[in-house]
UniProtKB/Swiss-Prot annotation:
Inducing or repressing factors: Rapid but transient down-regulation by wounding, salicylic acid treatment or pathogen infection.
Name under which the protein is recorded: Uncharacterized protein At3g17950
Stretches with biased composition (Low complexity): 1-19, 61-74
Tissue: Expressed in inflorescences, stems, rosette leaves and weakly in roots.
Region annotation (Disordered) ranges: 1-27, 54-94
Oligomer status and interactors: Interacts with RLK902.
Gene (name only): Y-3
Amino acid sequence: MQDPHVPSSPTISSVSSSDLDTESTGSFFHDRSITLGTLMGFSFTATMPMPFRASSRRHVSPSVAISRASSSNARRNHQRKRPPSNSAEPEPHRRRKWWRFCRDDDDDAAGNGIHRGTGDSKRSSLGEYLEVERRFGDEAVYNSAEAELEDAVVARYQDQQPVMGERALFADGRVLPPASAEVVTGEGTPVATSLCRFPVSLTGICSGGGG
């Protein structure tokens, strides 16, 4: 005789075994809401809260937007009202030439690059050097205008030599050795006969003779 307290095994035609979720537990739990997932502690997806997804466009409150706009306008007006910092400076200091071919003796002793303009030495600019090249050119230097240009360079070079009986530092485009075994006379040594020698061209255009 079958015990009435022991449930019978389900058959294929039973209602409790028709659902996949309750097929394994239909023999013990005829309530279709009880599944293996609920026994393990999982809840239904319908009862779970949906995760909050933030929108791609960030929402800015009107008060924050107004404060940002006012701060940007105040900053823009402050920049317009600000006077230029270098307006009080004199014109020579404000438009200072940074390029120098040679060292000037009458510059500021502190190395600030301020030209005092005493007239002892004249600064040679890059524009003057390029103007000489444009004026004479390669063909003029090697042909008819060579003598004229050489005379100008040699004359300026001789004017810059000290009147103390010292000999020249350059000759024929090369640095002369020290006069240790020679007697120094007042006559200067011949300078270069061609402007194409780079040291001589530098010596001719330098204001103080020192690079």
